């Protein structure tokens, strides 16, 4: 069976943990992860001034699709940049139309709202993004740490990054693999 593939879209201002933890956990599960820089291949300054080097540009990564999951990290500025990008809109709309998984964390789900993706789904966000996300009543809201409704998977923030990542792994390659990856991480139950 061919390896599952993930696209993580990295925008300036992304939250570091919400980017790196899902990438790491998915790679541990054997998922081929591409970290694509929204603005190109140059290192990206994240929300806490950590620089992350993308594998490629989003423009180049788009030509390598489709992906089994598209992941949107949070961070206020990062989510705003994702929300304002026509290319992100195109990728999300294609992913939705082909019934591929879309995963977004923290403020990242606000990009779904901006691009009119996943309307009707139950979602969660960082508590400070809830009002923005619920503007227009396009979604129902959950206080769950991770919420999966059909092919839309959302989570709350940096502290839920491992749960978010493991939920992606479970959705793509199964609960057994998620448990195998989780065990050596020494996470609190």
UniProtKB/Swiss-Prot annotation:
There is a cross-link at residue 130 (Glycyl lysine isopeptide (Lys-Gly) (interchain with G-Cter in SUMO)). Deglycase activity does not require glutathione as a cofactor, however, glycated glutathione constitutes a PARK7 substrate. It is found in: Cell membrane; Cytoplasm; Membrane raft; Nucleus. Changing residue 53 to A: Sulfinic acid detected following treatment with hydrogen peroxide. GO terms for cellular component: cell body; chromatin; cytoplasm; cytosol; endoplasmic reticulum; membrane raft; mitochondrial intermembrane space; mitochondrial matrix. The keyword Isomerase does not apply. The modification N6-succinyllysine is found at residue 182. The modification Phosphotyrosine is found at residue 67. InterPro entries: Class_I_gatase-like (IPR029062), DJ-1 (IPR006287), DJ-1/PfpI (IPR002818), Prot/Nucl_acid_deglycase (IPR050325). The record marks 149-150 as: Cleavage. GO terms for molecular function: copper ion binding; cupric ion binding; cuprous ion binding; cytokine binding; glyoxalase (glycolic acid-forming) activity; kinase binding; L-dopa decarboxylase activator activity; mercury ion binding. Coiled coil: none annotated. The modification Cysteine sulfinic acid (-SO2H) is found at residue 106. Sumoylated on Lys-130 by PIAS2 or PIAS4; which is essential for cell-growth promoting activity and transforming activity. Undergoes cleavage of a C-terminal peptide and subsequent activation of protease activity in response to oxidative stress. It catalyses: N(omega)-(1-hydroxy-2-oxopropyl)-L-arginyl-[protein] + H2O = lactate + L-arginyl-[protein] + H(+); N(6)-(1-hydroxy-2-oxopropyl)-L-lysyl-[protein] + H2O = lactate + L-lysyl-[protein] + H(+); S-(1-hydroxy-2-oxopropyl)-L-cysteinyl-[protein] + H2O = lactate + L-cysteinyl-[protein] + H(+); N(omega)-(1-hydroxy-2-oxoethyl)-L-arginyl-[protein] + H2O = L-arginyl-[protein] + glycolate + H(+). The active site is at residues 106, 126. Signal peptide: none annotated. The modification N6-acetyllysine is found at residue 148. PANTHER family: PARKINSON DISEASE PROTEIN 7 HOMOLOG, PROTEIN/NUCLEIC ACID DEGLYCASE DJ-1-RELATED. This is Parkinson disease protein 7 homolog. It comes from Mus musculus (Mouse). The lineage of its organism: Eukaryota, Metazoa, Chordata, Craniata, Vertebrata.
């Amino acid at each position: 069976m061919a390896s599952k593939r993930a696209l993580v879209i990295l925008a300036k201002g992304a939250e570091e943990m919400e980017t790196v933890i899902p990438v790491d956990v998915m790679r541990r599960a054997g998922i081929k992860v591409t970290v694509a820089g929204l603005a190109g291949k140059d290192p990206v300054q994240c929300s806490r001034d950590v620089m992350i080097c993308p594998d490629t540009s989003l423009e180049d990564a788009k030509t390598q699709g489709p992906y089994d999951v598209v992941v949107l990290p949070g961070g206020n500025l990062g989510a705003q940049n994702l929300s304002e990008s026509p290319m992100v809109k195109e990728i999300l709309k294609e992913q939705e139309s082909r019934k591929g998984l879309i995963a977004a964390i923290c403020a990242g789900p606000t990009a779904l709202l901006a691009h009119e993706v996943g309307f009707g789904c139950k979602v969660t966000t960082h508590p400070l993004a809830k009002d923005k996300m619920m503007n227009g009543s396009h979604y129902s809201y959950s206080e769950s740490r991770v919420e999966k409704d059909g092919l839309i998977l959302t989570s709350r923030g940096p502290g839920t990054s491992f749960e978010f990542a493991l939920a992606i792994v479970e959705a793509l390659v199964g609960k057994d693999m998620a448990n195998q990856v989780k065990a050596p991480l020494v996470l609190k139950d």
